[in-house]
């Protein structure tokens, strides 16, 4: 299904409509340039749609130095937007993988988190997307991903719970098959 992308001017008019919907005057001094600022910020906030995960992970190193344990990158900070309410959720991602024939520069793991976070998301889907993209592109023995996040849709509206942390995990390969690897990963990340 192809979606016709509106022009910037149509998007700005949509922001003006929302401002009128909440009872504001989009032409008053403080709001006059708000549509421009919102569209510019949305281009950055949602820039993940333009990112190619395969390109991010294409530079691999085959010399693993006979490393046979797991590699982890913990505490990758992110902010994304919930696709249900278009409100932000923020937290940390922990990624581990057990290399088979190659490794990747650790900054690449942070880049794929950013690529998926800078889209409308749900945390569950983002957890799977990160794990599966590492699995598909690096072909490791297994991948583990844990995301812990605070959701504005819980703190700013509805149940008004501002300290509730949602945790999601996804495992592939040896992490999915062998509890000892999951246990080690969870012990490592539970202190973070």
Curated annotation (Swiss-Prot):
InterPro entries assigned to the protein according to its UniProt record, in alphabetical order: GTP-CH-I_C/QueF (IPR043133), GTP-CH-I_N (IPR043134), GTP_CycHdrlase_I (IPR001474), GTP_CycHdrlase_I_CS (IPR018234), GTP_CycHdrlase_I_dom (IPR020602)
* Annotated EC: 3.5.4.16
Q: In which pathway does it act?
A: Cofactor biosynthesis; 7,8-dihydroneopterin triphosphate biosynthesis; 7,8-dihydroneopterin triphosphate from GTP: step 1/1
Q: Which Pfam families match?
A: GTP_cyclohydroI
Any one GO cellular component localisation term in the record: cytoplasm
Alphabetically sorted, this entry's keywords are:
GTP-binding, Hydrolase, Metal-binding, Nucleotide-binding, One-carbon metabolism, Zinc
In Gene Ontology terms, what is one molecular function of this protein?
A: GTP cyclohydrolase I activity
Catalysed reactions, as listed in the record:
GTP + H2O = 7,8-dihydroneopterin 3'-triphosphate + formate + H(+)
- What's an example Gene Ontology biological process for this entry? tetrahydrofolate biosynthetic process
Tell me the residue numbers annotated for binding Zn(2+).
82, 85, 153
Which Gene3D superfamilies does this entry report, sorted A to Z?
Answer: 1.10.286.10, 3.30.1130.10
Top class in the EC scheme = hydrolase
Origin: domain of life: Bacteria
* Record NCBIfam families: folE, PRK09347.1-2, PRK09347.1-3
* Assembly description: Toroid-shaped homodecamer, composed of two pentamers of five dimers.
Q: Which family does it belong to?
A: Belongs to the GTP cyclohydrolase I family.
Protein name as it appears in the record: GTP cyclohydrolase 1
Source organism per UniProt: Rickettsia bellii (strain OSU 85-389)
Instruction: List the lineage, top down.
Output: Bacteria, Pseudomonadati, Pseudomonadota, Alphaproteobacteria, Rickettsiales
